[in-house]
Amino acid sequence: MRHFDSMEILNELLKFQSITPDDDGAFNYISMILNDFEEINIDKNGVKNVIFRKTFGPGVHICFAGHIDVVKPGIGWDSDPFDPLQKDGFIYARGAQDMKSAVASMICAVSGVQNFNGTISLLLTSDEEGDAVFGTREALKFLQSRGELPDFAVVGEPTCETVFGDTIKVGRRGSINGILRINGIQGHVAYPNKCVNPVHILASKFANFAGHDFDNGNDFFEPSKLVVVDIRGGMQVCNVTPSDVSVMFNVRNSNLTDANDIKNFINDLYKDCDFDLNLKVSSNPFLTDKNSKIVQKLSQSVQKISGVCPVFTTGGGTSDARYFAEFNVDVAEFGVINDRLHAVNERVSVNEVQKLTEIYKDLIENF
């Protein structure tokens, strides 16, 4: 079996225009490299999920996970976003950081395993950047139905902030979206006594609403803050008061706050008003015990290869790691620096990719 270098793999992966949920042939390329692994295809509603798996012994099952899809490149690039350009120690292309670099490192690491007292798998999806409804979660549901869920998982999201090796994600905040609509009575602006202006009602308590912290956070989570993202009301005319005004907001919640806490807060704040509230839980917070074997072993490998002692955090947006937590799989996330995510001229350091590959290899060898 020919050995594939992680940089060679990355260079090829970056050529695929795998905009969600189209893999554009990337899975065929990966299948060619991992041709001695069992391959399980789980396709649903146009989303492709592939599990590559090899069992070496009766021990634990470690799953490396990631996504092959990327967001649209947009305009303004200095080079073709799907024709990787290597320059000054970096590779420029869409998906370089998020997250084909980690996928390439994972493929290289697992393909070279000769001895391991357990099972090694690689779970990849073509829908993480989109709705992610039929992606990683669907693959895990399939494994659960067969009693084959992994014991531990590593997700290759780009976690590092300023220096490679500085951050391991051991959890993520949840995400709750909400729309608050204050109802009033429309009327002529010259006769305010005959109207009920919902904007005035909203404004009277808005300082206590916008930016509200539902908790004080803890060692791993920042406070759960209500962030207003949009306000709409009226007909954009100067002589009619609106019949209602709507506020769209989001709460990235810790494990100390849930949807009921948000509902109770708003019900109390606007208890004397006519309003409607709609809340949607997009994802739940999770936290992997810092003493979990996957966290400790990953931390040791990061320190050994990068020379940096990583901190354990839960910041940033949501990721597919939450689905592993949902299925009670201990999960940690580690990848390259994340300073160009979804940006024009996205790039990744060649040195980081090579070190990331060594970290994944070391984790397997010493688990």
From Swiss-Prot:
Co-factor: note: Binds 2 Zn(2+) or Co(2+) ions per subunit.
Q: Which family does it belong to?
A: Belongs to the peptidase M20A family. DapE subfamily.
Instruction: Write down the EC number.
Output: 3.5.1.18
Cofactor(s) demanded: Zn(2+); Co(2+)
**Residues annotated as signal peptide:** none
UniProt gene name: dapE
Q: Which HAMAP family does the record associate with it?
A: DapE
Q: What does this protein do?
A: Catalyzes the hydrolysis of N-succinyl-L,L-diaminopimelic acid (SDAP), forming succinate and LL-2,6-diaminopimelate (DAP), an intermediate involved in the bacterial biosynthesis of lysine and meso-diaminopimelic acid, an essential component of bacterial cell walls.
From which lineage does this chain's organism come? Bacteria, Pseudomonadati, Campylobacterota, Epsilonproteobacteria, Campylobacterales
Q: Does the keyword Iron apply?
A: no
* Catalyzed reactions per annotation: N-succinyl-(2S,6S)-2,6-diaminopimelate + H2O = (2S,6S)-2,6-diaminopimelate + succinate
Protein name from the UniProt record: Succinyl-diaminopimelate desuccinylase
